[in-house]
């Protein structure tokens, strides 16, 4: 790969990340009824299973679909199911999903999502605002 190809690949990756971020945020807004941004909305034990699955999937992509399909069929929590479906319906990478929902010391919650990833969410909001202004 020469320098030009590498730069083109980086540009494509950035563009894909912006598109993926927008799809993730749109999907979450559609699937989760947002109230007060700091109101905890925990996924409970399903969220813990989801994070474990995401870790496995990030390391062993080939096994991830079977594991996800099994988990999706057994989940009772629609929010956890919605996050899993991002991977297979919208093509979202596990790494991006984990980026928004992962923390070792805290439960998965909207409070955590807003606090820990406020900068990333602000970038998504800015991108969506730019898209709306340009439309």
Name every feature range the model reports, one short phrase each:
Residues 101-119:
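Short, basic interhelical loop/turn and adjoining N-cap
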Residues 88-92, 105, 121:
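Residue-level detector of secondary-structure transition/capping positions
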Residues 66, 77-81, 118, 122:
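Generic detection of well-ordered alpha-helical segments
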Residues 11, 62, 82-84, 112-114:
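Short alpha-helical segments used as structural interaction elements across diverse proteins
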Residues 1-74, 96, 102-107, 126-135:
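N-terminal interaction/assembly modules
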Residues 75-96:
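Short amphipathic alpha helix immediately N-terminal
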Residues 113-131:
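DNA major-groove recognition helices of helix-turn-helix
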């Amino acid at each position: 790969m020469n320098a030009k190809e590498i730069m083109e690949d980086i540009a494509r990756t950035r563009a894909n990340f912006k598109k993926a971020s927008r799809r993730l945020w749109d999907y979450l807004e559609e699937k989760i009824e947002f109230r007060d941004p700091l109101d905890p909305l925990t996924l409970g034990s399903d969220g813990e299973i989801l994070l474990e699955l995401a870790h496995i999937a990030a390391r062993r992509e080939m096994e991830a679909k079977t594991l996800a399909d099994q988990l999706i069929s057994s989940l009772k929590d629609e929010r956890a199911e919605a996050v899993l479906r991002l991977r297979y319906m919208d093509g979202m990478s596990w790494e991006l999903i984990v980026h928004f929902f992962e923390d070792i010391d805290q439960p998965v919650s909207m409070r955590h999502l807003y606090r820990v990833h406020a900068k990333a969410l602000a970038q998504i909001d800015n991108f969506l605002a730019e898209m709306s202004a340009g439309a």
